[in-house]
């Protein structure tokens, strides 16, 4: 596992960071480039869709 690899915990931590930045409001991942890139990278590495990776970031439940 490299420094820039995205795992479940790191993806959830990045989503939480965006959630705090929005004062616990609605998080649009496209407005946060670090979160958007992490979701795309996670989806590519794990063979799931962008939406499934976003659900994992939000809830912690794997849908794939």
Language-model features and meaning:
Residues 6, 12-64:
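Acidic, low-complexity, intrinsically disordered interaction modules
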């Amino acid at each position: 596992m490299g420094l820039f690899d995205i795992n479940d915990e790191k993806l959830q931590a990045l989503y939480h960071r965006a959630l705090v930045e929005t004062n616990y409001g609605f998080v649009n991942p496209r407005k946060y480039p670090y979160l958007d890139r992490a979701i795309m990278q996670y989806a590519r590495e794990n063979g799931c869709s962008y939406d499934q990776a976003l659900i994992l970031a939000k809830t912690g439940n794997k849908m794939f």
